[in-house]
Every structure is written in C-alpha cells, then in structure tokens.
Amino acid sequence: MRKAEISRKTAETDISVTVDLDGTGRYDIRTGVGFFDHMMDQLARHALIDITLRCEGDLHIDDHHTVEDCGIALGQALTRALGDKRGIRRYGSFHLAMDDALVRAALDLSGRPFLVWNLPFPTEKIGSFDTELVREFFQALATHGGITLHVDLIHGVNSHHIAEAAFKAVARSLREAVEPDPRRADAIPSTKGML
C-alpha cells in the first residue's frame, strides 16, 4: 500500500497529513488559508493522489509558517509513501495552459532535493495571499520530498492563473512520476540500485 500519514507539531503549526498515491484525487484540505486550500485541492485532484490535510497555524502573524510547513509535511508524507521507489516511473513533466498562463513543470523523484524556479508574478498578492508563498511551498515540498523540481512560466499576466497553472503542472508531473511502471515493476529506477 502506497500510503502514509505524517504528524508534525512545532511552536508555529500543528499539521496532520495523509496521502494515498493510488487514490483518485480525493481531497479534504483545511489550513485556514483559503487560496492555499484551493491550490492544494488542485494538487490532489490533478495528481490523482488522495490528500487529507489539517493545519492549525499562527495565522495571526501571517500565512508563511502554515504554507511552508504544509509543504514540509506533504514532502515527508510523499517520501514515506514512496518507500524505496521500486517500480515507479520516477520522472514527470507537463505543460499546463490556463487561460493566459502557460507553465512547464518537470521533476525527478531522485532523492536529491533541488528547486529551479522561474515563475515571476505580476502582483505581490492574490487577494490577501502573498504570491511569494507559492515558491516557499514548492521549496519545502522539494526539499522534504527529495524532489528535483523545475517550474517555469512561459507566459502569463494573471497571478491567480499563474499560481493555479503551477500547482496543476506540478500535480500532473507528480502523477506521472509516482505511477507504477509495468515494464519495471520490481526495479529501482536508477543504475545505482537505489534512490
């Protein structure tokens, strides 16, 4: 079973997350940050990963700790659910168009965390949500999920569309990478013999 549950409690956040890599994209996300919940819904739906996420954060300060720590916990849950990564495709990439926005995401579940980020936003906020937190989330996800992740904006003028296209592009890339490879069902997808 490719499932995992993570609980993470700090002075800033109290998080529980469960993932099922062989799900259907069901989600139940409650972080207290409306726009971020909407983005996480998109991530689950388009990755076909069932995600339940609860976060009690210090939102009286700002959204930063909540968003970043959810990325940390989700990355840890993905790592645990993938186990030794035997039989997965490992790589994924996707170009996602959403109205004016076109975003490319490519990733490798290599165990070597790295983020290449070329996603400038035309505004600093989407409603009350700081657009810089999109990068913070993906940095935390990549670092704690052991993911090499590239996200590039090819075109876009609307910050909401850019953010949503990024979450969906990463989701579709993740969906491809975690998918079992029927031709290599028992193999680690690396010439090193481990990831």
Swiss-Prot record:
Principal place of residence: cytoplasm
Spell out the InterPro entries in the cross-references.
IGPD_sf (IPR038494), ImidazoleglycerolP_deHydtase (IPR000807), ImidazoleglycerP_deHydtase_CS (IPR020565), Ribosomal_Su5_D2-typ_SF (IPR020568)
Keyword hit for Cytoplasm = yes
Q: Is Cytoplasm a UniProt keyword of this protein?
A: yes
What reaction does this catalyse? D-erythro-1-(imidazol-4-yl)glycerol 3-phosphate = 3-(imidazol-4-yl)-2-oxopropyl phosphate + H2O
The EC number of this protein is 4.2.1.19
Taxonomically, which superkingdom?
Bacteria
**Example GO BP:** L-histidine biosynthetic process
Write out the pathway annotation from the protein's UniProt entry: Amino-acid biosynthesis; L-histidine biosynthesis; L-histidine from 5-phospho-alpha-D-ribose 1-diphosphate: step 6/9
SUPFAM superfamilies in UniProt: Ribosomal protein S5 domain 2-like (SSF54211)
Coiled-coil zones = none
Give the family from UniProt: Belongs to the imidazoleglycerol-phosphate dehydratase family.
The protein's name: Imidazoleglycerol-phosphate dehydratase
Q: Which organism is it from?
A: Cereibacter sphaeroides (strain ATCC 17023 / DSM 158 / JCM 6121 / CCUG 31486 / LMG 2827 / NBRC 12203 / NCIMB 8253 / ATH 2.4.1.) (Rhodobacter sphaeroides)
